[in-house]
């Protein structure tokens, strides 16, 4: 079971891969939203043993290219409301926010809600179903 937390921003993302009990599969690393780097990320995610789910927050439109790319590559992607992730895990007195910590928090959120994660469906796909 691999939870991939992706903290998305404009043109780049911070990635963290976690397993249950706080096991770090991959220390947080950054990728650009280029074809080459998304292809490398896809190859890496497919090489992981066990089931893998990618979790990211709705971030305006910035999440869409990476979510679509990974979904089209056959990887499970779940896009969640940022407020749910923000409220997850209690509050910290320090309130330190970094992309690395956010990616880890998103991955841990995914682990705790593994069974309930809804798979991402692009808007066009939803329109075709109507």
Predicted features and spans:
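Phosphate- and other anionic-substrate recognition elements at nucleic-acid/protein interfaces
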Residues: 1-130
């Amino acid at each position: 079971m691999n939870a991939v937390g992706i903290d998305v921003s404009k043109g780049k993302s911070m990635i963290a891969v976690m397993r249950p009990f706080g096991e770090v599969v991959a220390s947080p690393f950054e990728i650009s939203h280029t074809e080459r780097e998304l292809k490398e990320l896809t190859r890496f995610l497919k090489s992981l043993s066990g089931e893998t789910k990618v979790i990211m927050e709705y971030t305006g439109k910035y999440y869409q290219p990476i979510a679509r790319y990974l979904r089209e590559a056959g990887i499970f992607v779940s896009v969640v409301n940022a407020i749910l992730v923000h409220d997850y895990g209690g509050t910290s007195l320090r309130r330190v926010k970094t992309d690395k910590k956010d990616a880890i928090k998103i991955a841990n959120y995914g682990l705790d809600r593994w069974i309930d994660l809804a798979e991402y469906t692009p808007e066009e796909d939803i329109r075709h179903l109507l």
